[in-house]
């Protein structure tokens, strides 16, 4: 299947560090445009963190003009307060994308790992090394949160950007 040229933004939501990765698809080949992290750990309260997430995701969308966005779904943990905060962070990132009328797909962490490495239980380091190979990167990003964002974008490309039972499409909630 030939995929038309497009830019995909991948997001890995977090409450202390949020990772992102941006890839360009040209003639069905992937190229990394940018990757990085949004540092949130120095901000005093959760509301300021949410504000920064919204602003930075909005900036990334305005700067790189992605055609589609992929976001990692929160994993299920035992600490309810942490899960609520993570859900808010993801929701704010999604709201920033949706205000720009972009389609967004959500992928479970296991689905992303499976798409990148062939193993849904792969470590972050294994995912990073496979991304290095797939994207022909000379060196890995310094933060694994950045590679997680990049992995979401690559997973979305591998899935063809089409909804299936493993992901949710938030572009058409009418």
Task: Describe the function of each predicted region.
Residues 1-174:
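Phosphate- and other anionic-substrate recognition elements at nucleic-acid/protein interfaces
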């Amino acid at each position: 299947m030939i995929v038309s040229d497009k830019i995909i933004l991948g997001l890995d939501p977090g409450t202390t560090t949020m990772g992102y990765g941006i890839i360009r698809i040209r003639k069905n080949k992937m190229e990394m445009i940018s990757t990085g992290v949004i540092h949130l750990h120095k901000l005093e309260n959760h509301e300021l963190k949410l504000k920064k997430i919204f602003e930075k995701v909005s900036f990334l969308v305005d700067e790189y003009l992605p055609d589609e966005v992929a976001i990692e779904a929160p994993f299920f943990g035992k600490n309810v307060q942490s899960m609520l905060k993570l859900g808010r962070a993801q929701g704010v990132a999604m709201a920033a994308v949706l205000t720009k009328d972009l389609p967004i797909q959500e992928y479970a962490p296991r689905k992303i790992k499976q798409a990148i490495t062939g193993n849904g239980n792969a470590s972050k380091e294994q995912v990073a090394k496979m991304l290095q190979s797939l994207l022909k990167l000379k060196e890995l990003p310094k933060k694994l949160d950045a590679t997680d964002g990049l992995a979401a974008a690559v997973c979305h490309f591998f899935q063809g950007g089409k909804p299936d039972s493993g992901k949710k499409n938030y572009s058409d909630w009418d």
